[in-house]
Amino acid sequence: DLMMKNIYNLNATRIESENFELRINYRDDAVGFNNPSLNEGTLTRDKPLIRLLGLDRLNSNNDPQYDGNFDFVVGFTINTDRGNIIFPVLEPFGSTLDSYFQTNSETDLSERYVYSELYEMTQDEAEKVLSKNKFFIVGTVSSGSGSEINLPGLGISENSVVVTAGNLQLVEGTDYTVNY
């Protein structure tokens, strides 16, 4: 399974770059909210996780310069057809993150933040390590995966069709159409 390694599925297909936003947040119990960076570490303090983990290396002109945004590079950081985010490093939350902590003086930070269990255990086992399971990929995605769905039966009552995306109920006429 590719999940929890360096490829993550966004559960959308035919992703479009327009309006695409992606961040990696860390749930920081010390401050009580999700943070796009770590609050400590010589090389990690206040540096966006998206940069530390290799997903922000280019600016909007594809020049090698950080800009705080996800590098939407088809085939390198994203597979738009399958809806996969691709970290350009093998163990983003393991050895890659660990490489930023000073060997002698920051072993406590390495022990606190590095989620090596992702690469040593099954996904189910790793998710149960609550002290480390605090990283989240969040953002906005537009998908061109529209398709037709044939509803069974005849004479479907108008406004009787309910469509949801996750737990969000979509609005007929705005988010989808029904040909009664």
Task: List PLM regions with ranges.
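Surface-exposed, low-hydrophobicity segments enriched in Gly/Pro/acidic/Ser residues
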Residues: D1-Y180
